[in-house]
């Protein structure tokens, strides 16, 4: 929005041309989203407390979690609001990818909001029934997949890029739609499963989102893309502003969500942020790198799949409790130790993801 205004004002003073620089707008984006989260955060917490929108805690989980009962939840709405405002202010609203990611985030946020509302306000422990949640996730995921497929202008935009190998791009054809669907919906649910401890999901989301912003910047610059042997996707660089806003909003939320948390993001936040990460990874053609950098999300998801499969087949559980962060808690790890160690793992995996740019 402001980019269009400054473009007009630059006719009268050259100072305003500075806002054409993507890097500056990304910095302003992260600062704006951070400021909104920090300034509005306390007010949101007070409002949620007044409305008695508090977290319900499982009685069969770690006993240390019982004290979390009643902690305000649905704070993901604050993250979405901060990202949206910052992106609309500093992003190029003529860019299709900005709108795709924004709309996917908002759509999945609505699904999460309905689920949270039914659980917390209507006191329905099931929330939104799983089949309906998956149905709407599928609708929105497929809508994004079809749009990206039919608006792709080059074959590289729908090919699977294999990291660590030079010039290995697998043409996907219509299978691109299937892959995109699973990446978006899968990442959305993976972040949701990870969001079980104070700050556990939000910092890895910030780290992976920030890294994807760097990939978006490189993919959107034809010189960098050519040098690094990654596909050039015209316009994808503008997603750096969105990723910067995500990082700022996430860090601002972490201020209140760090142990002991004053607020939880709820499904409205985790489903939306996960879907946004998946969509960005698809646009910049780094689905496999997302799998690496988001290793914590993958680990949490796989632990649930293995636990359910093992119990159905053998009536025995592999882990004391799934997702796996609860397993470590029940083994005696203090909650902050689990959280920080998972953060450290994510930092290492993000660095591995960056290394794939040069190791080929």
From Swiss-Prot:
Pathway(s) it belongs to: Cell wall biogenesis; peptidoglycan biosynthesis
Catalysed transformations (reactions): UDP-N-acetyl-alpha-D-muramoyl-L-alanyl-gamma-D-glutamyl-meso-2,6-diaminopimeloyl-D-alanyl-D-alanine + di-trans,octa-cis-undecaprenyl phosphate = di-trans,octa-cis-undecaprenyl diphospho-N-acetyl-alpha-D-muramoyl-L-alanyl-D-glutamyl-meso-2,6-diaminopimeloyl-D-alanyl-D-alanine + UMP
GO biological process terms on file: cell division; cell wall organization; peptidoglycan biosynthetic process; regulation of cell shape
Record PANTHER family: PHOSPHO-N-ACETYLMURAMOYL-PENTAPEPTIDE-TRANSFERASE, PHOSPHO-N-ACETYLMURAMOYL-PENTAPEPTIDE-TRANSFERASE HOMOLOG
Job description of the protein: Catalyzes the initial step of the lipid cycle reactions in the biosynthesis of the cell wall peptidoglycan: transfers peptidoglycan precursor phospho-MurNAc-pentapeptide from UDP-MurNAc-pentapeptide onto the lipid carrier undecaprenyl phosphate, yielding undecaprenyl-pyrophosphoryl-MurNAc-pentapeptide, known as lipid I.
Family stated for the protein in its record: Belongs to the glycosyltransferase 4 family. MraY subfamily.
Example of a GO MF term: UDP-N-acetylmuramoyl-L-alanyl-D-glutamyl-meso-2,6-diaminopimelyl-D-alanyl-D-alanine:undecaprenyl-phosphate transferase activity
Broad class of the protein's primary localization: membrane
CDD domains the UniProt entry points to: GT_MraY (cd06852)
Name used for this protein in its record: Phospho-N-acetylmuramoyl-pentapeptide-transferase
Enzyme Commission code(s) on record: 2.7.8.13
Species name: Marinomonas sp. (strain MWYL1)
Cofactor(s) recorded in Swiss-Prot or TrEMBL: Mg(2+)
NCBIfam families linked: mraY (TIGR00445)
Keywords: Cell cycle, Cell division, Cell inner membrane, Cell membrane, Cell shape, Cell wall biogenesis/degradation, Magnesium, Membrane, Metal-binding, Peptidoglycan synthesis, Transferase, Transmembrane, Transmembrane helix
Pfam families cross-referenced by the UniProt entry: Glycos_transf_4, MraY_sig1
Topology in the lipid bilayer: Multi-pass membrane protein
Compartments, record wording: Cell inner membrane
Superkingdom to which the source organism belongs: Bacteria
């Amino acid at each position: 929005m402001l980019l269009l205004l400054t473009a007009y004002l630059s006719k009268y003073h050259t100072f305003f041309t500075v806002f054409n620089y993507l890097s500056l707008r990304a910095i302003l984006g992260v600062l704006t989203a951070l400021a909104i989260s920090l300034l509005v955060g306390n007010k949101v917490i007070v409002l949620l407390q007044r409305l008695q929108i508090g977290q319900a805690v499982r009685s069969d989980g770690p006993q240390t979690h019982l004290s979390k009962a009643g902690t305000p939840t649905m704070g993901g709405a604050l993250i979405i609001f901060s990202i949206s405002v910052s992106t609309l202010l500093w992003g190029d609203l003529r860019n299709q990818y900005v709108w795709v990611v924004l709309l996917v985030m908002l759509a999945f946020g609505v699904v999460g909001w309905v689920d949270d509302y039914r659980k917390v306000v209507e006191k329905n422990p099931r929330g939104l029934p799983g089949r309906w949640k998956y149905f709407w996730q599928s609708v929105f995921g497929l809508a994004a997949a079809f749009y990206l497929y039919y608006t792709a202008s080059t074959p590289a935009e729908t090919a699977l890029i294999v990291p660590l190998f030079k010039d290995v791009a697998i043409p996907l054809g219509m299978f691109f739609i299937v892959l995109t669907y699973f990446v978006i919906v899968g990442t959305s649910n993976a972040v949701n499963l990870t969001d079980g401890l104070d700050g556990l999901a939000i910092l890895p989301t910030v780290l992976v989102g920030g890294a994807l912003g760097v990939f978006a910047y490189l993919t959107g610059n034809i010189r960098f893309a050519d040098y690094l042997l990654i596909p050039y996707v015209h316009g994808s660089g503008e997603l750096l502003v969105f990723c910067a806003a995500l990082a700022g909003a996430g860090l601002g939320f972490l201020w209140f969500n760090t142990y002991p948390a004053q607020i939880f993001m709820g499904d409205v936040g985790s489903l939306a942020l996960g879907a946004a990460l998946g969509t960005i990874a698809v646009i910049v053609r780094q689905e496999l790198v997302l799998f690496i950098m988001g290793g914590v999300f993958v680990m949490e998801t796989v632990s649930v799949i293995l636990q359910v499969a093992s119990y159905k087949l053998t009536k025995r559980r592999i882990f004391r409790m799934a997702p796996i962060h609860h397993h470590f808690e029940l083994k005696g790890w203090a909650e902050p130790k689990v959280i920080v160690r998972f953060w450290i793992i994510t930092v290492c995996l993000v660095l591995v993801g960056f290394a794939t740019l040069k190791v080929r």
